[in-house]
Structures are given as C-alpha cells and as structure tokens.
C-alpha cells in the first residue's frame, strides 16, 4: 500500500544538524504519493527520497532556500532511479532558483504534467521541462533578483509547439517582444503585469 500524502510543512528540515537518525544504507524513503516539504529551510534538493525508490507523484518544495538543483539530483550518473518516472507534479515556488538541470527532461520525468517555479530568480526560461510530451501546465510568474528587479525578459519561443501544454503562467515579469503565433490550444495564458510586452493575439481573437 502507498499512503496518499504526508505533510512536513512548517518545520526546520534542512537546517544545521542531522535530520535522518539512521544511515543512508538503512533509510527506506517515504511510501507516499504526495510529499509536502514547504516552509522549511531546505537548501539541497532531497535526492534521498528518489534514490531510495519513494513512489512520489507530487512533491511540494515551495517556500524553502534552494538556489540551484544540480545535475544528478533526480537521477544517478547512469540510468534512472526506480520510481522517479512516477513524478508528475513539482512545486518549487518561493525559492531562490536561477536555473534547472537536465534532470528535468523527459528522459528522467516522462510523465511530468504540472510544474511551477514562480517567485524565484530565473533570468532565462528553463526549457528542460518543455521536453515532456505530457506537460500541461507551467508557471514562472514573478522572477526577481536580490534587489527586486524584474529579470525574466525573453519569451520562450517555440512553447506553443509543446503538444500537451494548455496553461502558461508568465505574468509579473518583464517579457518584451513575443515573436510567436499564439494557438488556441494554449487556452490559459497569464501575461498580466508585463509592462513592456508586445504581443500579437490576432490568431486567437475568435477564441477570446
């Protein structure tokens, strides 16, 4: 049996000291579908959960202290961990991330359908998750640097060709010229609060 969900929010996980009392050889992971670790002090992506074969489909890591998720955080150097392919939903909002590694491509996460990296520090669009043919929704609202400046300016050209994507949340940034023809398939598009945006919506006017 697999538990529906476990919630470890509002703790001090990831702070100084040892969080796991046993050795990694004895650690068996978490037998749950949804794992919530929001509002902690996590600086390093919890690779241990996936290395031990935890059957996680949704992981919520919002409101932590991660600045990067380096390569081999979701997979070993060769091949993949046993159950990482089960992961469909990833919430990384309210961290300090500036980039994603190739761990987030379809070769590791073939069924990724929902991902949100809003309220981070991306200055360029992380295209790795767009490689997933199952991706339906992606959020990347409100990207700021340490001084609070809007730093995401470039539209992710080609995003309308993602076969399953129906929702893109890219508001509250500084997106400029959009040189791409929109399609009605992308029927939830949040571009609000991009003060310098230039976009042609003629192709989707009949659907608005």
Q: What are these regions, as identified by a protein language model?
A:
Residues 1-3, 11-14, 22, 32:
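LRR N-terminal entry segment and analogous cap-like coil->beta motifs
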Residues 1-2, 27-31, 51-55, 75-86, ...:
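Leucine-rich repeat
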């Amino acid at each position: 049996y697999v538990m529906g969900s476990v919630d470890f929010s509002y703790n001090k996980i990831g702070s100084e000291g040892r969080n796991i009392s046993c050795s990694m050889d004895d650690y068996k992971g978490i037998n749950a579908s949804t794992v919530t670790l929001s509002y902690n002090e996590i600086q390093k992506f919890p690779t241990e959960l996936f290395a031990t074969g935890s059957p996680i489909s949704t992981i919520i890591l919002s409101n932590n202290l991660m600045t990067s998720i380096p390569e081999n955080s979701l997979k070993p150097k060769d091949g993949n961990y046993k159950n990482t392919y089960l992961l469909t939903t990833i919430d990384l909002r309210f961290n300090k991330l500036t980039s994603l590694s190739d761990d987030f491509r379809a070769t590791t996460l073939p069924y990724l359908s929902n991902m949100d990296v809003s309220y981070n520090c991306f200055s360029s669009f992380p295209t790795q998750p767009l490689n997933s043919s199952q991706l339906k929704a992606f959020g990347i609202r409100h990207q700021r640097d340490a001084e609070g400046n809007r730093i995401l300016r470039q539209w992710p050209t080609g995003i309308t060709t993602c076969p399953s994507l129906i929702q893109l949340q890219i508001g509250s940034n500084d997106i400029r010229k959009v040189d791409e023809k929109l399609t009605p398939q992308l029927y939830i598009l949040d571009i609000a609060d991009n003060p310098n945006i230039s976009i042609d919506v003629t192709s989707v006017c009949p659907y608005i």
